A protein has these predicted regions:
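Carbohydrate-binding surfaces of carbohydrate-active enzymes
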Residues: 1-332
């Protein structure tokens, strides 16, 4: 029910080939990734929204923000969202007017790259937009849903993915820690749980506590472990009980480690010594070596296959060299 908009056009406002602020666009991307990762670690379910897709497939129908066949009740604008497309802004205005919820961690001040007083006023209006402070810890209660609820597993190593099906829900749990187990419970709608064994392909029953039409399911995941469950809307007969949880025993390593290839392979060598007209440039990355070689032979921007698009044969017809034009030596 939650759509998080990607700040793509906002980042492009700061990016140029010779950027006067070369770190701003990169920092914005890192901050946005940290934001959505934090949501995932706290089991917030959301989709990512592209403004370009909204342009062709987005609409506002009542208090629902519609993208294709999906409809959302909440739209989130991250702190990095400084610009919105005009089409996106129009959708957000109509969505808010019908009671749709918008959570903004920043105040977009630009529409289609131009400063907009209308946008500033809209996103600052508490009657239309729920303001959230990007400088404070995320208030995860804003994203609570009656459909599914987790306890607070220690360490925030748990990630999950859920899909609604015709007769129930598919729930995948994964422990991202390589050293610590993750234990806890999850509560969601359903009447019976089944374990889908991804190793054997078997389907077995899985113990759960039922209260009305809701199930509380306990999980206990080994480091790097996972669990795939199916939660049925109605009870099913004939499901064998799940096998007992295996106990892992640490086995100390004995002897040295020997590795050998199963078959011949390719080893990429990224560095070389470049020789141009008798001058040697040692220990260059292959990208830099190619750039220097092309520049030496008249391509001012460097490697044309990295910096330009060829029109007809304008690049290949400049290949008049009979001896290659350079020497590259690779060290093993």
């Amino acid at each position: 029910d939650v759509l998080v908009l990607e700040p793509t056009t906002s980042i492009w406002m700061y990016y140029t080939y010779n950027a006067p602020r070369p770190n701003r666009w990169r920092t914005m991307g890192e901050e946005f990734q940290a934001f959505i990762t934090a949501l995932e670690r706290h089991q917030v379910e959301f989709d990512l929204g592209s403004e370009n897709i909204l342009l062709n497939h987005g609409s506002a129908k009542g208090d629902r923000f519609v993208v294709g066949k999906r409809a959302y009740g909440t739209v989130v604008l991250p702190a990095q969202m400084e610009n919105v497309d005009a089409a996106t802004f129009d959708l957000l205005e109509r969505f808010a007017a019908k009671g749709g919820r918008i959570i903004a961690y920043g105040t977009p001040q630009y529409v289609d790259g131009a400063r907009s007083a209308e946008a500033e006023a809209f996103f600052a209006d508490p009657a239309k937009v729920t303001r959230a402070d990007a400088g404070e810890p995320i208030d995860y209660s804003l994203f609570a849903t009656p459909e599914i609820a987790f306890d607070a597993p220690e360490g925030n190593y748990l990630f999950h993915h859920r899909r609604r099906m015709d007769d129930g829900q598919l729930l995948f749990l994964a422990n991202s820690s390589l050293t610590r187990p993750v234990r806890g419970t999850v509560t969601l709608q359903g009447r019976q749980a089944a374990l889908l064994d991804t190793r054997t392909g078997e389907i077995r029953g899985y113990e759960a506590q039922r209260e009305g039409d809701r199930l509380t399911i306990a999980y206990d995941l080994h480091p790097a472990g996972s669990l795939l469950l199916y939660v049925f809307d109605e009870e099913r007969e004939g499901l064998a009980p799940a096998p007992a949880r295996r106990v892992l025993t640490a086995v100390p390593a004995a002897g040295g480690l020997t590795a050998k290839p199963d078959a011949p392979n390719v080893m990429t060598i990224d560095f070389c010594d470049l020789e141009l007209d008798g001058k040697v440039y040692p220990d260059l990355n292959s990208y830099d070596a190619a750039k220097l070689a092309y520049q030496h032979h008249g391509f001012k921007a460097g490697n044309p296959w990295s910096t330009s698009v060829q029109f007809r044969d304008h690049t290949v017809r400049r290949d008049t060299f009979t001896m290659g034009g350079f020497n590259a030596s690779y060290r093993f």
